Structures are given as C-alpha cells and as structure tokens.
C-alpha cells in the first residue's frame, strides 16, 4: 500500500475511544462543563441498559441525573452532587435514582472532570454502578402490601447480606477488586485522558516504524543484507580460509547487528490492515512471530563459530560454511521494505542495478564452482584439459603444475583472477553479448550456460527492456496514487494554499487511499448489473441495516432500494461535515469514529458509532438550516443518504415509512437549536450585579433644593422655547381680576386690578415679538377681567409702542421704547390739536349701570387739504374712549376716540419703563436672596452629610409701591413658583 509506510498518523481526538475501552464494563455519561446544568453530550450503551432510557432521551438532560430523581432521593446527596459540579471536583456518592419505568435503584456514582490541553475543564465523566444488592430493601408503595412469607424471605436475605458484609474478605480478593476498579474506573487527573487533538502515542519502549532512527536503521540493514548476499556465496564457492581474523570479526559483527534487528522488530510498530498504526506490544510480538521471525532467526545463527576452533575436520568446516547460504534469507528484509524504497526514483534505479549485479555475482560463483570441480579428477588425480579453468590458465600464462612430493596439483590463476573471469563470463552471457574468449567446453558447463542464458535473457528483458511496462502493470494503483499526490502538491503550491490546510488535504488523500486501496467503487459498481449492484450495496451497508431498529421491518426490496442510494464517505480528523447555516440535505449514520457537534463554540453533543444526525425529512416540508457545526474528532466512516432519495423510497414503501418514522430516533437533530446559557456568562452577570450592588449611589432626593433649582431652570428653558414658537404670539394675554380697594372706598376712574401673567417666563409686563412685526408695529395686548360683574369686562389696552428688537427688559427696553417714541412723536406732530381732542371724563354712574363696556366708534378721515386731517369724532360717549396705549394693531379701521399729544405719550412710556425697571430690579434682588439662602442650605447639608429636608415656604416679600401717577391702577403680578415658596406674589 503506498500510504502504508506511515499509516494513519494524523492528530486525532481519541478521548471517546479511550473512555469506552477503559469503561467497557461500566455505565457512564459525558456532560459539557461549560453550559448551565451540564447537559449530557454522550451516553454509552451500558447506561442506556441500566436506566432504561434511549440515548436520544438522555441527550441534553442534566448530567446530575435530575431527570432520574424521585421522592426517595436524598436531598442532601443532590446538593452535594451539584456542589461537586459547581466546584469542578472529583467525588463519589451513593444515590437512589429511578429508572424510566420509575423503579428505584441504588447507584454508586463517580464524577470526574475532563480537561483539555489548556487545563480547562470541558467535560464531566459520570460513571454508575448498580449497588442495589448491597443496600437495604427500598421501602415504597410496592413493598407495603407484601405477605408474611415475602417479608420472611426478605428478612432472611437481609441477614445473609449483612453477614456477607460483616465477614472479613480475603486479602487477595480485596486487592483484586480494588485493582480492577482502579483499572476500569480510575478518576485521577493523571489517569483520565484529555479531550484534545493529539498524535497517536506509543509506549516508551515502542519504536515508531517511520521515525528517523528506524529509517536509518533500515538502510543499514539493507546495506548489510547486500553484503551478506555477496560474501556468503563468495566464501562458499572460493573456499576462503577461515583463519582470516579480520573477515571473521566482520562477519560476527554483522551477525550481531542482525540479532539486534530481531530484538528491535519485537518493539517496532506496524501498519494494520485498516491503515491504523498498531502500537500494542502484545499485537506487535504476535504479528512478528507469525511472519518473519523464523526466517530472521535462521539467517542470524553464528555459522562461523566452528571456524574459531583449530584442528577441525575439513568436511565439518565445509558443511558449516555451506550453511551460510541460509543467510541469504535476509533478502526477505528487502522484500518487506521494498514498498518503502520504491517511493524514491533514485533508490529504484540503484536497486535494479544491484539486483542485476547480484544475480551476475551468484552465477559467477556457481560458474567457478563448476570449473573447480571438473578441472582436477580426484579419482585419477589428473587434470581435465577441456575445462575452462585449464584453458584460462594457459591463456594468462599461469598453468597448473603437479607437485610429486605432495601428490597434488598446484599453480593456476589466482582467486582474484578467477573471480573476475567468472563474473566477466556471466555478465556477457546475461547481456547476450558473449565474446567467446571464455566458453563452456564440458557438458556440465554447457548445461549451466544454457540455463544461465535463459535466466539472463529473462532478467535482461525484465529489468532493461520492459521495466516501465512491468512497473505500470504491477503498480498501476501506485503510479496513479503518486500521480494524484503530485497533482495535489502542484495545485497546493500553485495557489499557495496555507500549510495547515495543505496538510489536511494530503492527510485526507492518504487516508482515503488507504481505505479504498485506490479502487473506484462507483466504477466497479457501474460494471455490475442492477441486481448484483444492489446485493453489493446491501453488503457494504450491512452495519447500518443491522444496528438500527428502524430497518428491521424493511423488506428485501426496500433494503435494496435504500442500499443503492446510500453513499460511504471517509472523514479525516478536523473535517467539517456540516457548517452552521448551510442546508441539511442528508441523513448521516456513524459507522466508525467519533464526531462533535459545536454550537456557539460549545460542544453540545459527541457522536460515536451507531449515532444518527441530520433532519427528520419525512416530517418536515422545508429544507432545514444547520444550527451547529459537525466536526470529525477521529477518522470516521459515514453512511449518508440524500433527502430526495430517502423521500422517494419512503413514498413508494408506505408501510416501511410508518415503521421508519416511528423507530428511527435522531441522536442530534440539526434543525433544532439548543438553548443554553454558558456558565461564564452567568458568572459575568453575577459579578456585574454584585458590582452595581456595592456601588455608592449619588442620587439626590426629589425634594432636595438642588434638584428643585435645576428643575426650575429646566422648566424656564422649556417655557421660553414654547413662548418663542407660539402660532399667535402677538397677544400675550394677562388675566386681570378687579377687586375692591382695601379701605373699601370707591374712587371714580380708579380700580384695583390683579394681573396674573400667563407666560411664567417673564416676571414683568413684556412684549412678545411675533412674525407680524416685520410688517407692522408691535403692540402689547392685555385682557382685563374684573371679578365683580356677572359678565366680566374685557378691556384691551392697545399700545402704540413699537418693538424693533423683540422683547426687552431694563435699559434695553428703554432704548427700544425711546426709538419708538421718537418715531411716534413725528407721527403725532402731523396731527392737529382739534383732531386729537376727546372726552376724558366718564360718568361713574353710567359705568356702574351698564354691564358691558361699549367701544366708542372713532373714525378718522383724511381730507384733501394740505396737512389737515378732519375728524368726525362724536363725543356722546367720550368717557368710554380708550387711550392710545389701548390701540390694537389688528383693528386698522376702528374709530379712535382721541389722539394724545406726543409729550403725553412720551411721558407715559417713560413711566412704564421706569416701573418695569424697578420691578425687574426688585425681582432680581429677591431671587438673588433666595438663591443665596438655597446655596447656604446646600453647603450646610453637604457638610453634614445628612438627608436634606424640604425647606419651609418663604414668606412673601413686599415690594415698595412706586409713586402713583394720576389715573394709575394698582396691579398684583404673580410669577412662577420657586423652590422656596409655593406662592410668591409681588405687589406694587
């Protein structure tokens, strides 16, 4: 296998596999430690059998097993369990829980936190052991109606159990149980595996077969193997003297190295049939003993040890020397490592040349042995002149000589010359050249030459003639595999794919190739007929059909229809099967491996063998969006079926559809989003609440003077904005209430009027600037409403004063009024004295008798005479005439009773300005006094650090009444409430 050199060595999260292996005989749950209530993300089959719940029923329930609590469950134990989870501790409890059928059972519950590579607790492991037999019988409603016999039986059973508990156990038995429990349910932080991605680990005394040391060692063994393959035939054929200490030591060192290699093979990992790396020492030893151990042992026996002794029989020495040929079995090491070396092009070329030369060397040794055996006839002690050795000796001038004293033949070519000549002959024969200077003459030599030519022709044709074709036929998948890898590498290099993603791509290709062995399943199935293809698909998906009860009632035809639609995919660690937000268009069955479901960066479920995830297509009409990511933790094999294909089969097989929808339970439904709260978020909220609780609040009471002061400023600002934005701000109405004088006297033409200002912004009579001031003169409008009559008198005072710059106070208003009087003065100068005369007196009786004030219709007509204005003023109701101050700008055609002279108008305006300035000064002084008192109170309260109390109302501050002028009314002007008093009136 091309990918078999290293095996599947990508980092993977084998936490679930390790826990299942260690707790194979127990029941356990896995809960997420980062989500509120620690929901269950995995439960093994043992817990499902013990509790009676299906895995889908247990998922997302609390790891504290609160769903199994009942009326007999101890409340204190429940609280201790929750505290253990809150504190991320390890602990064990004896707790009474209820099965799904509400049967009470005593459990020995052990809790242990699982940490990741950052030492953060991410999971909780909860193991359960049924200890009901060791506890007292549970008293519930079902046991209250027992008969006397049943109670007697229970009493006997209790007595026996008590005796067994009180009887001292055997020491060995106790140690055995303790060690067994420690092996299966050890909950120490050093023993429990971590939940993280990690490369496959090996024990300390196990060597990885792909590590640098082992790779170097394999190349050394390869070189020594070739050395053995060369020297063993040479020593056997040419009978080299074993007394050569150097060669003897070298051979002994080689033998020791091969013995060390045997020891290392007992501690070296190997690749299993599924592509996984086997690091279990027991499996490694059994595998080596069954395969290459015997061959390696025979090739490492010290056959030269006999040569270390002197006076050894020549026959025995030759026998042991011949046994050295067994060392050629070391070539098996080359065969088993051949797939390692064939991955390199230069190594392939070197190996081919070495093989050709090695065969030529072996044939040369055999060729010399034949010549040496035939050149001297041991029976007659004569030399054969037709042997190739004799002919060679004659040709090179080193003939054989007979030693009469010793009775043996001596001389002849040297061993080096003989070996070179033998190798020369075999090479020319193998390459079909054959120069003819060395040729076979005897029958044996000719027979060997024929055999050598046959082998040589085949070897030559194989290695040099058709090497490319043979490799393509023998390693077609290998060539395709390397071609695919090269294409992928070029693609990744061309588009500069990141290193991490490149490694994932390469690992996925290697792992997929190791699983499929380079065989295109779809291509093979397309060759088969429909019936055979369906049978093959049923066989390929047999694990899904046999493990899930939803397929048990399916007919053969239904299974065949489903099997054809199933697809098998292989996922590498870290691969995402579903991204959050993408469409869920397939139903996935986990056959091997483990996956995790991640929602909002939290693990909400861990899926293993036999789990199903996806969507319930047969109950939903729309295509679902994945609410979480599904990521592979290890190498996974998934069998998936598309939504359309599944619905098509269910629509056709209606009977199976009902059974399928009823019996198939999804372990994880990606359509439904799991609602949870993170413990970290809850802690943050609690910290924020505590922080706000501990903060010192700097709030001021509602009745505090400072709050009242700022509230007053705010109200004044709002009212000022409202006053400037009124739709008809031309008329600033004043409510005037007439009331009798305090002394009770009635003065003709004089009344007491209370003027309450509607707009609380102004503390004195002011003029409001309107939009019409750009076209005509500004005038003040006031309504006088006496309280005495049934029908209140409404008097409008029309002022001829023009406001150019809007509302003003103090000297600013005086300045504006002065400019207005100067303009008015010019106007009055153009009016004659006769036209400005009118009746100024009014009969008091007439005013008292009438309930309403009638307006005097004054009409002014301009004559055509130069500068003379005629007046048809009638003086029948002169007492009711209005002053020029009461002139309304809106009544342009009204009749005017009289027109005062310019000096009187100027005097009136000055008096008004004077009064207003005094009022403003008095009001400002009062407010400054009030503000000073309030500031003093604030400073006093702040210094004492006590709760401020509501200030008492401030008494009214009377203002000095200015000197009266003739026909002057007394007004009482009210202003807005201040923080010091509810009513603050100013009389003048």
From Swiss-Prot:
Residues the record marks as carrying a glycan: 403
An annotated Gene Ontology molecular function: delayed rectifier potassium channel activity
Region (CAD (involved in subunit assembly)): 909-948
InterPro entries assigned to the protein according to its UniProt record, in alphabetical order: cNMP-bd_dom, cNMP-bd_dom_sf, Ion_trans_dom, K_chnl_volt-dep_EAG, K_chnl_volt-dep_EAG/ELK/ERG, KCNH_animal-type, PAC, PAS
Regulation: Inhibited by low nanomolar concentrations of cytosolic calcium.
Cytoplasmic side: 1-217, 265-291, 341-346, 468-988
Keywords associated with the record: Calmodulin-binding, Glycoprotein, Ion channel, Ion transport, Isopeptide bond, Membrane, Phosphoprotein, Potassium, Potassium channel, Potassium transport, Transmembrane, Transmembrane helix, Transport, Ubl conjugation, Voltage-gated channel
Region called Calmodulin-binding, residue ranges: 704-715
Bias (Basic and acidic residues): 871-885
Sequence positions bearing Phosphoserine: 883
Catalytic activity: K(+)(in) = K(+)(out)
Cross-referenced SUPFAM superfamilies: cAMP-binding domain-like, PYP-like sensor domain (PAS domain), Voltage-gated potassium channels
Major location category of this protein: membrane
Region (Disordered): 718-742, 839-897, 946-965
GO biological process, one term: potassium ion transmembrane transport
Binding-site residues, a nucleoside 3',5'-cyclic phosphate: 550-667
Motif stretch (Selectivity filter): 432-437
Glycyl lysine isopeptide (Lys-Gly) (interchain with G-Cter in ubiquitin) cross-link, chain position(s): 785
Transmembrane segments: 218-238, 244-264, 292-312, 320-340, 347-367, 447-467
Domain remarks: Contains a voltage sensor domain (VSD) formed from the S1-S4 transmembrane helices, a pore domain formed from the S5-pore loop-S6 domain and the C-terminal cyclic nucleotide binding homology domain (CNBHD). The segment S4 is probably the voltage-sensor and is characterized by a series of positively charged amino acids at every third position.
PANTHER family xrefs: POTASSIUM VOLTAGE-GATED CHANNEL SUBFAMILY H MEMBER 5 (PTHR10217:SF533), VOLTAGE AND LIGAND GATED POTASSIUM CHANNEL (PTHR10217)
Protein family: Belongs to the potassium channel family. H (Eag) (TC 1.A.1.20) subfamily. Kv10.2/KCNH5 sub-subfamily.
Task of the protein: Pore-forming (alpha) subunit of a voltage-gated delayed rectifier potassium channel that mediates outward-rectifying potassium currents which, on depolarization, reaches a steady-state level and do not inactivate. The kinetic is characterized by a slow activation time course and a small voltage dependence of the activation time constants, therefore, starts to open at more negative voltages. The activation kinetics depend on the prepulse potential and external divalent cation concentration. The time course of activation is biphasic with a fast and a slowly activating current component.
Protein name, entry field: Voltage-gated delayed rectifier potassium channel KCNH5
Organism listed in the record: Rattus norvegicus
Organism taxonomic ancestry: Eukaryota, Metazoa, Chordata, Craniata, Vertebrata
Gene: Kcnh5
């Amino acid at each position: 296998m091309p990918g078999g050199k290293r095996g599947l060595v990508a980092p993977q999260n084998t936490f679930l596999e390790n826990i299942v292996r260690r707790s194979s005989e127990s029941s356990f749950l896995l809960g997420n430690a980062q989500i509120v209530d620690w929901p269950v993300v995995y439960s093994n089959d043992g817990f499902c059998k013990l509790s009676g719940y299906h895995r889908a029923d247990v998922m997302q329930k609390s790891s504290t097993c609160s769903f199994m609590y009942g009326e007999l469950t101890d409340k204190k134990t429940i609280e201790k369990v929750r505290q253990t989870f809150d504190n991320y501790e390890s602990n064990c409890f004896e707790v009474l829980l209820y099965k799904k059928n509400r049967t009470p059972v005593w459990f020995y519950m052990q809790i242990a936190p699982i940490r990741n590579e950052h030492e953060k607790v991410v999971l909780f492991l909860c193991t359960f052991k049924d200890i009901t037999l060791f506890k007292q019988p549970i008293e519930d409603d079902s046991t209250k109606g027992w008969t006397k016999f049943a109670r007697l039986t229970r009493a006997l059973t209790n007595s026996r159990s008590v005796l067994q508990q009180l009887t001292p156990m055997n020491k060995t038995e106790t140690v055995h149980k303790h060690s067994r429990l420690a092996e299966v349910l050890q909950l120490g932080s050093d023993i429990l595996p971590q939940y993280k991605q990690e490369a496959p680990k090996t024990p300390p005394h196990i060597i990885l077969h792909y590590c640098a040391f082992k790779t170097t060692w394999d190349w050394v063994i390869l070189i020594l193997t070739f050395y053995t393959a060369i020297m063993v035939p040479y020593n056997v054929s040419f009978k080299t003297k074993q007394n050569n200490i150097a060669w003897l030591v070298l051979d002994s060192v080689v033998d020791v190295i091969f013995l060390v290699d045997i020891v290392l093979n007992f501690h070296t990992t190997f690749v299993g049939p599924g592509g996984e790396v086997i690091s279990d020492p027991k499996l490694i030893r059994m595998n080596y003993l069954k395969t290459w151990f015997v061959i390696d042992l025979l090739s490492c026996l010290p056959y030269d040890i006999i040569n270390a002794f002197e006076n050894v029989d020549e026959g025995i020495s030759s026998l042991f020397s011949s046994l050295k040929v067994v060392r050629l079995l070391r070539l098996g090491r080359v065969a088993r490592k051949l797939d390692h070396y064939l991955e390199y092009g230069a190594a392939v070329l070197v190996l081919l040349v070495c093989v050709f030369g090695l065969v030529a060397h072996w044939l040369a040794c055999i060729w010399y042995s034949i010549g040496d055996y035939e050149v001297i006839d041991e029976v007659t002690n004569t030399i054969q002149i037709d042997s190739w050795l004799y002919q060679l000796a004659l040709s090179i001038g080193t003939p054989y000589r007979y030693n009469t004293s010793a009775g043996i033949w001596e001389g002849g070519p040297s061993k080096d010359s003989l070996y070179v000549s033998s190798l020369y002959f075999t090479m020319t024969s193998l390459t079909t050249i054959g120069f003819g200077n060395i040729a076979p003459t005897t029958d044996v030599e000719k027979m060997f030459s024929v055999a050598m030519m046959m082998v040589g022709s085949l070897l030559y044709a194989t290695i040099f003639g058709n090497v490319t074709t043979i490799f393509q036929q023998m390693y077609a998948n290998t060539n395709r595999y390397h071609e695919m890898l090269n294409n992928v590498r070029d693609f990744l290099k061309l588009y500069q794919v990141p290193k991490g993603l490149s490694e994932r791509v390469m690992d996925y290709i290697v792992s997929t190739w190791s699983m499929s062995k380079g065989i295109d399943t779809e291509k093979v199935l397309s060759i088969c007929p429909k019936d055979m293809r369906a049978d093959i698909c049923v066989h390929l998906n047999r694990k899904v059909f046999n493990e899930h009860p939803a397929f048990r009632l399916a007919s053969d035809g239904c299974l065949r229809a489903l099997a054809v639609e199933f697809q098998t995919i292989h996922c590498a660690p870290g691969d995402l099967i579903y991204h959050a937000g993408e469409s869920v268009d397939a139903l996935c069955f986990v056959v091997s491996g483990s996956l995790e479901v991640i929602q909002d960066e939290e693990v909400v479920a861990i899926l293993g063998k036999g789990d199903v995830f996806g969507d319930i297509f047969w109950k939903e009409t729309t295509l679902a969006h994945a609410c979480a990511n599904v990521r592979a933790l290890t190498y996974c094999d998934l069998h998936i079926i598309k939504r359309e294909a599944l619905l098509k089969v269910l629509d056709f097989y209606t009977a199976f559809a009902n059974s399928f929808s009823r019996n198939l339970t999804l372990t994880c439904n990606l359509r439904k989003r799991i609602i949870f709260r993170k413990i970290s978020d809850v802690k943050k909220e609690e910290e924020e609440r505590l922080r706000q609780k501990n903060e010192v609040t700097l709030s001021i009471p509602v009745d505090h003077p400072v709050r009242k002061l700022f509230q007053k400023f705010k109200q004044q600002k709002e009212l000022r904005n409202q006053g400037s934005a009124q739709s008809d701000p031309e008329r600033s109405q004043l409510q005037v209430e007439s009331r009798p004088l305090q002394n009770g006297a009635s003065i003709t033409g004089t009344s007491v009027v209370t003027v309450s200002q509607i707009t609380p912004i102004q503390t004195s009579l002011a003029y409001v600037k309107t939009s019409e001031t750009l076209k005509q003169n500004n005038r003040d409008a006031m309504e006088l409403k006496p309280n005495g009559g049934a029908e209140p008198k409404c008097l409008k005072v029309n002022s001829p004063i023009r406001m150019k710059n809007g509302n003003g106070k103090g000297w600013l208003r005086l300045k504006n009024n002065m400019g207005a009087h100067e303009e008015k003065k010019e106007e009055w100068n153009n009016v004659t004295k006769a036209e400005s005369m009118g009746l100024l007196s009014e009969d008091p009786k007439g005013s008292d008798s009438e309930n309403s004030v009638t307006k005097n219709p004054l009409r002014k007509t301009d004559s055509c005479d130069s500068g003379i204005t005629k007046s048809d003023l009638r003086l029948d109701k002169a007492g009711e005439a209005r002053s020029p101050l009461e002139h309304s700008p809106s009544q342009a055609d009204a009749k005017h009773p009289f027109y005062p002279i310019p000096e009187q108008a100027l005097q009136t305006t000055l008096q008004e300005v004077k009064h207003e300035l005094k009022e403003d000064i008095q009001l400002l002084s009062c407010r400054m006094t009030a503000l000073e008192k309030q500031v003093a109170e604030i400073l006093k309260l702040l210094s004492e650090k006590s709760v401020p109390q509501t200030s008492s109302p401030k008494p009214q501050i009377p203002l000095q009444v200015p000197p009266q002028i003739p026909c002057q009314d007394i007004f009482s002007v009210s202003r807005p409430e201040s923080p010091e008093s509810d009513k603050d009136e100013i009389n003048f």
